[in-house]
């Protein structure tokens, strides 16, 4: 099949969150399985261009309509991780993607409306006829109504549209007249059955448009797909998702084991694998390798070399991620004879300031270290050198960090929500087979909830080493590669392609 993904992010060159990793991982797996896969993203001035090979101009002066005028664009083509990627560079006086950032501009909505119209115009003008156009999140959701109501009428009819929702919190709400910028009649779409926002009827909801107009809709875990049908997690779109439940499914994200793998990880000072894991108490070879990385991590972050577990946390510092719980656990972990490492940053100035104050408070603390900027090397060291990994999210569509932690033999402590509930089975769960248990789970998003899970984990680490070793083994054995997830997508691609 020929599949084109249109997205706002792509790892490793334009990454803000998990969306970038998902687009790369899924596309690589589809390509490895013999499918023709292309990707279209904006040509950001701040992306890591060194990750692009053989970048050349593919379409010079592509015209695209915006706000009553036609503007030229240059479309570049290059190769990223052996995938063909098209980069759209607008020649618009507002320099939509020359801002030194991926998101966070006041006119983000207009930037991605422009990108969406231009991406579709490129496919149409070049007569590129894929079987599937796969859209991601609100930034490209408007392509679905654009395609169905404009480009199909121009004779561009072959592709089917699949739309993936990565996070219901971000929906792309705008005024009806904003759709006029890209040639759609905004007033026409301000109807409940089209794109009218369910909570604020004077607004248009781009995410809703993606749901209504796509041939199929997915989200990033089976449990999150159930949760978003409820008012709590549906964020106002639960009724729309219930209405279109016949074309809606949750597919768990995978991770790329060619990158996240302690056996071959280029960032680690030593390597270890499941095959080398100890079979009994006397066999300490691999534990010693993980312990060696733990020692290096402590030295790098000036933590005390004591018989204590390290609890790691790698996250964006936004309310969704349970930042109040993270702040609370710092002291609790130390009181329970643990050490805590945080790697994260926040796009929200008040939260960023708050954590910088905490960092100052814990300067030179022998058991606490906060890193408030991204470091890929440190991320890998923390996954490998930690004993436990906390993910206290208030909601979590899928979550990748807990899956990565499992591969590194680092036991997750998570809240039971979204994809965390799909991937982590509590060690004390009575209805699960012993080899399926791989972590600690709590329900209530409060201090008592997370404290109880941390206490159980730390107690096991100190008092039940054989049980702890088995938890590590169980996690490392689990397969969350893209192989199975990509097969689920392929079945949907094939099913919707077969429909007239």
UniProtKB/Swiss-Prot annotation:
A single BP term in Gene Ontology: glycogen biosynthetic process
Carries keyword Glycoprotein? no
Enzyme class, spelled out: transferase
Q: What is its EC number?
A: 2.4.1.21
- Which reactions does this protein catalyse? [(1->4)-alpha-D-glucosyl](n) + ADP-alpha-D-glucose = [(1->4)-alpha-D-glucosyl](n+1) + ADP + H(+)
Which keywords label this protein? Glycogen biosynthesis, Glycosyltransferase, Transferase
Question: Could you tell me one molecular function GO term of this UniProt entry?
Answer: alpha-1,4-glucan glucosyltransferase (UDP-glucose donor) activity
Domain of life where this protein originates = Bacteria
Q: Give the family from UniProt.
A: Belongs to the glycosyltransferase 1 family. Bacterial/plant glycogen synthase subfamily.
Any idea what job this protein has?
Synthesizes alpha-1,4-glucan chains using ADP-glucose.
Q: What is this protein called?
A: Glycogen synthase
List the source organism: Protochlamydia amoebophila (strain UWE25)
């Amino acid at each position: 099949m020929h599949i084109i993904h249109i997205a706002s992010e792509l790892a490793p060159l334009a990454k803000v969150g998990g969306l970038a990793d998902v687009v790369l991982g899924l596309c690589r797996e589809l390509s490895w399985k013999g499918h023709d896969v292309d990707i279209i993203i904006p040509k950001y001035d701040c992306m890591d261009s060194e990750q692009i090979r053989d970048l050349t101009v593919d379409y010079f002066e592509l015209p695209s309509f915006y706000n009553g005028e036609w503007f030229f664009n240059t479309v570049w083509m290059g190769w990223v991780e052996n995938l063909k990627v098209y980069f759209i560079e607008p020649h618009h006086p507002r320099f939509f993607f020359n801002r030194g950032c991926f998101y966070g501009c006041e006119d983000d909505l207009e930037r991605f409306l422009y990108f969406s119209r231009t991406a579709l115009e490129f496919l149409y003008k070049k007569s590129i006829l894929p079987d599937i156009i796969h859209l991601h999140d609100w930034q490209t959701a408007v392509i679905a109504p654009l395609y169905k109501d404009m480009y199909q009428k121009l004779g561009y009819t072959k592709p089917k549209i699949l739309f993936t929702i990565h996070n219901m919190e971000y929906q792309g709400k705008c005024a009806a007249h904003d759709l006029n910028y890209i040639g759609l009649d905004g007033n026409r779409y301000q109807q409940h059955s089209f794109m009218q926002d369910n909570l604020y009827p004077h607004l248009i909801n781009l995410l809703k448009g993606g749901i209504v107009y796509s041939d199929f809709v997915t989200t990033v875990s089976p449990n999150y797909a159930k949760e978003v049908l409820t008012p709590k997690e549906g964020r106002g779109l639960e009724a729309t998702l219930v209405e279109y439940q016949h074309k809606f499914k949750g597919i768990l994200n995978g991770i790329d084991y060619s990158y996240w793998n302690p056996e071959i990880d280029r960032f680690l000072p030593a390597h270890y694998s499941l095959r080398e894991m100890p079979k009994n108490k006397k066999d300490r070879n691999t534990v010693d390798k993980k312990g060696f990385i733990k020692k290096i991590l402590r030295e790098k972050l000036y933590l005390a070399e004591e018989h204590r577990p390290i609890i790691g946390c790698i996250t964006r510092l936004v309310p969704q991620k349970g930042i109040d719980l993270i702040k609370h656990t710092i002291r609790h972990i130390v009181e329970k004879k643990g050490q805590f490492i945080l790697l994260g940053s926040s796009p929200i100035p008040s939260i960023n300031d708050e954590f910088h104050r905490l960092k100052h408070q814990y300067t030179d603390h022998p058991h606490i270290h906060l890193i408030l900027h991204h470091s890929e090397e440190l991320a890998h060291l923390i996954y490998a050198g930690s004993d436990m990994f906390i993910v206290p999210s208030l909601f979590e569509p899928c979550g990748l960090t807990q899956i990565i932690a499992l591969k590194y033999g680092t036991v997750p402590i998570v809240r039971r929500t979204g994809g965390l509930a799909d991937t982590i089975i509590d060690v004390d769960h009575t209805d699960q087979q012993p080899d399926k248990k791989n972590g600690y789970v709590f329900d209530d998003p409060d201090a008592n909830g997370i404290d109880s899970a941390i206490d159980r984990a730390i107690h096991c680490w100190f008092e039940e080493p054989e049980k702890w070793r088995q938890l590590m083994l169980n996690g490392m054995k689990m397969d969350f590669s893209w192989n199975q997830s990509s097969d689920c997508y392929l079945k949907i691609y094939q099913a919707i392609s077969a429909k007239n």
